[in-house]
Amino acid sequence: MIHDRIEDFLASLPRTGALAGLDLGTKTVGVAVSDGLRRIATPLLTVRRTKFTEDAAKLKAIADERRLVGIVLGLPRNMDGSEGPRAQSTRAFARNLVQVLPLPVGFWDERLSTVAAERALLEADTSRKRRAEVIDHVAAGYILQGVLDRLDWLGREGGA
């Protein structure tokens, strides 16, 4: 099931279990995963996109191996909050993904996640070549960590 509201996404999840964060691009999918208690997001890898069936098979293998219980997709909103073609493409990807990988899917505003990831990599004095290799899954880590922090806050506040 696909959820626009993070509160609904949280309600659809078991109490524990790892989540994945995806930063969907036209050529790559950055993947990050959380620990089972959903405290820390760790950038995992970048999947080079080919055909949807192949991309979905790779994501399903990761989900099975990591025993994921949910997926967060970064939703690329425009700076004014509206949704353009990239957001529509992300929503279509989610609709197709749940047909192959029947896990709860939530969306998270990904505005500036790549900028934050780039800044962190620059501060770590990462070479340009290495930044290009890891930027997508580091951005996925930022997206997922934002969700984990929000889920933690909702759990403490009883807002879910």
Swiss-Prot record:
GO terms for cellular component: cytosol. It holds the Pfam family RuvX. The keyword Hydrolase applies. Its EC number is 3.1.-.-. GO terms for biological process: rRNA 5'-end processing. Coiled coil: none annotated. The keyword Transmembrane does not apply. One of its GO terms (molecular function) is nuclease activity. SUPFAM superfamilies: Ribonuclease H-like. Keywords: Cytoplasm, Hydrolase, Nuclease, Ribosome biogenesis. Signal peptide: none annotated. CDD domains: YqgF. It is found in: Cytoplasm. Could be a nuclease involved in processing of the 5'-end of pre-16S rRNA. Belongs to the YqgF nuclease family. This is Putative pre-16S rRNA nuclease. It comes from Cereibacter sphaeroides (strain KD131 / KCTC 12085) (Rhodobacter sphaeroides). The lineage of its organism: Bacteria, Pseudomonadati, Pseudomonadota, Alphaproteobacteria, Rhodobacterales.
